[in-house]
Design a protein with these regions (language model features):
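Short glycine-rich substrate-engagement loop in P-loop NTPases that contacts/grips substrate
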Residues: 41-44, 80-118
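A short, basic N-terminal segment
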Residues: 1-41, 190, 201-206
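Walker B catalytic acidic pair
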Residues: 125-127
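Walker A/P-loop nucleotide-binding motif
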Residues: 55-73
């Protein structure tokens, strides 16, 4: 049995090594998520249901300012606290830039992909941000990398949380194979947000 002080150190270590700013975790909890609109309440209900029902994939899509990052980080840290599981945060744009730069460096590329594929919980934030070419298609290098991550995590039954300013319908239109796979994996654990009421007042969900 782990004593409270040991448990606290383990959780702190997991969160500090996740890639997400540690000081933000205390602010981005489920308890701190504001629920003054029906949409906010629906987001929080989805998060609680995903945790309670031990879901594998969750997606929060739609407008900037809707509190997508807050609710997703809240879910991730709740899973860490419950199961002491490994967790990685992937800021899509910066992580994809690194992965593309390592394509011809097998060791660095493999190490980074291994971390993203094998971690118990992965949160991909701002999915597909700035990822379209002039024709409106997903850049092929990024599409291949993303599909590898999605497929390998599916095969390993790893918990994966996604947030994006694009809707699920828009992602399917960008690439039907990738979008359809994501939609299938997310199933009932997805929500589209408008964000229209979120950052107008003094308090906000980040």
């Amino acid at each position: 049995m782990m004593c409270p002080c040991q448990y606290k150190r383990v959780i702190e270590s997991i969160l500090k090594n996740s890639g997400f700013p540690y000081e933000e975790f205390q602010r981005m909890t489920l308890d701190a998520f504001e629920t003054t609109t029906e949409e906010q309440t629906a987001m929080k209900n989805l998060a609680n249901r995903f945790i309670k029902e031990d879901g594998y994939w969750m997606g929060v899509f739609g407008a900037s300012g809707a509190g997508k990052t807050h609710i997703c980080i809240a879910v991730c840290q709740e899973l860490v606290k419950r199961y002491r599981c490994s967790f990685k945060y992937m800021s899509y744009r910066s992580m994809m830039r690194q992965l593309r730069s390592f394509i011809f460096d097998d060791e660095k590329y493999s190490d980074m992909m291994h971390d993203l594929i094998e971690t118990d919980v992965l949160y991909i934030d701002d999915l597909l941000k700035f990822s379209l070419d002039q024709k409106g298609d997903i850049i092929q290098d990024e599409l291949r990398i993303l599909y590898d991550i999605v497929n390998e995590r599916y095969l390993r039954k790893k918990k994966t949380i996604l947030s994006s300013e694009y809707t699920m319908k828009e992602i399917v239109q960008m690439d039907e194979a990738l979008g359809s796979r994501m939609r299938e994996l997310i199933g009932d654990y997805g929500i589209k947000c408008s964000g229209s009421n979120y950052r107008l007042g003094g308090k906000k969900n980040g």
